[in-house]
Amino acid sequence: MSAKSTARFTPAGQLTAEDLGAIHLIGVGGVGMSGLARLFLTRGISVSGSELREWPSLAGLRALGGTIYMSHEVANLDGVDTVVYSSAIPQDHLELVEARRRGLRVLHRSEALAAAMTGRRTVAVAGTHGKTTTTSMVTMVLQQAGVDPSFVIGGEISEVGSGAHHGTGEYFVVEADESDRSFLIYRPFVSIITNIEADHLNTYGDLANLEAAFADFARLTDPDGFVVTCADDAGSRRLAETLRAEGRRVYTYGTSTDADLRLTEMASSTRGIRYLAEVDGRSLGEFRLPVPGRHMGLNSASAVLAAYLLGLPLDAAEAALAAFPGVRRRFERKGVADNVLVYDEYAYHPTPIALALRTLREVAGDGRLIVVFQPYRLYRTRDLQTEIAEALAIADELVLLEVFGPGELREPGEGSAALIEAVPLPADRKVFVDSWEAAPVEVARRARPGDVVVTMGAPPSSLMGEQLLDALSARRAGSPVGTVPGGEVGGATTIGGTVPGGSAPGASAAG
């Protein structure tokens, strides 16, 4: 591991959560930051946070004793010892600047999380995609085995309503983010790497550098621990070969005949997925998931393999996966209105976009699949435009929002206007809407009974599901098609950078 890659982050093990004193989190409402705040609050640590939007997570933080400021002000830092920020916060943010002026301890989210993990056996889940779902599955398997792990997940486990927990057991399960190299500060006992594909090229430049970073991450694994990765993924296979040549403990899973945990008779339907698992020709039994998709089966296999290598009872893994409720924003069913089924999905990289849309096409059956997509990050939309466009074309119809890219500088010609031209769908089956309110109206105009609609992409798009259901219900009730929740028609109100510069209302057809 090069010193350059982690120069601005403090490695794990140098701080404990109690060393941090009173903690303030800038932008506390997002899933990652709110989970961290919840973890500290349940450990009895004083926590405050600042936010500009009333995220659903904030009520829970207040109930735990957190102080939430609905503004960014220097006065928010009074009485604070440590200020925590995420990569979404610009370095010139007034609270960050003031914290440094006052000489307060300033930590990146990953550094604060590393402090919380001190003294525990860390199970870190990394990968280009599938991290949140896999971290959730591993967590539930450990919970079912009775070891009460602590965890911080980049999402909320459905029906649990939280992405963080302070447990009493020795294990701490964490989702490790490669986007800014911050995963290189962790010192895992178990490292799970789901896959390695081109992404975050603004940080790494090319795939070779990204693969090198994942190799560095794997090398940080405790010598008494092990690495788990996917034999069905080309990047992960290359990683496994490299690590084995270095004499490291690495184990693979997948349908490949040379996988250490081999999956056979895998079958997926709209009701879920099942497979048989074996090690060295010895059956470990049948495993079932109530969520569909081959990729979900592969994610779950990493949890089975980790449990097997940790010596945990596999009946716990079988039971946990059979009851897996899913993760919010990962193939999440939002509801039905006017016989149109609405889902929400976090996918924004071309591979998970394609996987999710193929699975949803099975769900749609004879109905059509309509995707409402908000690209996440200008650099990704630019670097992977062709691949994203091809993945979106799996849908029958596309409603495209402007790119969500907080803190990014927009160059001329960048954004969703360029992306929609690249999507190989007929002009009448794709549309770019330049306001948030226009999207539900457009979906209500296009969707027919029996269709499936999915909101997909950047975090703000998760807020649209209820609006779509309201618009479809209003259509059924005979309300004007242009009516949106709140009684407005059209409009150009933006959410979190949805429409740069305050575009005019309405929808403009692609073509």
Curated annotation (Swiss-Prot):
InterPro entries documented for this protein: Mur-like_cat_sf, Mur_ligase_C, Mur_ligase_C_dom_sf, Mur_ligase_cen, Mur_ligase_N, MurCDEF_pg_biosynth, UDP-N-AcMur_Ala_ligase_MurC
Annotated residues for binding of ATP: 127-133
GO BP terms, alphabetized: cell division; cell wall organization; peptidoglycan biosynthetic process; regulation of cell shape
Stored SUPFAM superfamilies: MurCD N-terminal domain, MurD-like peptide ligases, catalytic domain, MurD-like peptide ligases, peptide-binding domain
Enzyme class (EC, first level): ligase
Pathway per the UniProt entry: Cell wall biogenesis; peptidoglycan biosynthesis
Positions of region (Disordered): 481-511
Reaction it catalyzes: UDP-N-acetyl-alpha-D-muramate + L-alanine + ATP = UDP-N-acetyl-alpha-D-muramoyl-L-alanine + ADP + phosphate + H(+)
Bias (Gly residues) ranges: 484-504
E.C. numbers: 6.3.2.8
Localization annotation: Cytoplasm
GO CC entries: cytoplasm
Function: Cell wall formation.
The family this protein is said to belong to: Belongs to the MurCDEF family.
Name recorded for this polypeptide: UDP-N-acetylmuramate--L-alanine ligase
